[in-house]
Amino acid sequence: CERHDHDTLYKLLPKDGSVKLNPITTRLGVLVLAGPNSRKVLQKLTSTDLSNEAFPWLSGQAISVGHTSCHALRVNFVGELGFEFHHPIEQQVALFDLLMEAGREFGIKPYGIKAMSSLSIEKSYRLVPRELSIEYSAYESGLDRFVHPNKGEFLGRDALVAGREKGLNWNFVTMEVHGVSDADSDTRG
């Protein structure tokens, strides 16, 4: 995913050198706080208004969590209320410890990427590279609600609209399997 994004952005850079691409992946960390009590946990650590009105789903804000400055996103991939924190990597351990301590009264537990991946399938959230790739259009991937071709020009807009008018080759759907009580949760198969 990162390599693809880098290559795509690099190809789009102006040839005159007026814009530079500066990868910051190794300088930033990402932690996710998710679950029905995530707002209560986070509110203990920040003065930012975390209400739905002030911090709606799919929005982002610069906030402080304890002593850590973060770019917080009101999004996650586990199907619960949650927040993503993008922060300086050198603050990651302190931020993790702070979140765990603040969440102790709510029974907070850490979860890993494989658990997140399984939960995202359960919620029908698609991820790169599992379901989303350059091989399937946004419409084929079930991302219709995020695509607004009438809002103006964007890269690939004409091909996307033409593909939809022609008809979709694929349609991603979520299926539920009943009667299986012991299954491997590895979503990569």
Name what the model sees in each region.
Residues C1-G189:
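Conserved, structured C-terminal
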